[in-house]
């Protein structure tokens, strides 16, 4: 798997937080998609991210946590949907590309379990995050592209 080091630019994001079982993530993501449509934030101009605070392989389902995000130019106004403003910090990141289904993004495990121990790099104080390069109901699993970012010093 090809891993490269990039300088990620600080990115303001609109966030809908998911707390709970991984198998219910699609419900949270769907709510963010609806909010995104209402606010006219198309994916070709506003990137889609997932900030993964826990590993669903090792975390009890009730403690699992992911932020589903859309890049925005301005802070999000208070709203009934619970979408809030956060920032994905800028800095060095190791990046690996995952092609295919997002049900099991193997690039994340590769970065942590294979690449990191051999790299000589150390982690920064921000969790792994995914850039969902292409999104939409018209895409087949085999067409999905996900860039996985691991913040390093």
Set out the residue ranges of the language-model regions.
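A solvent-exposed interaction/effector surface
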Residues: 1-153
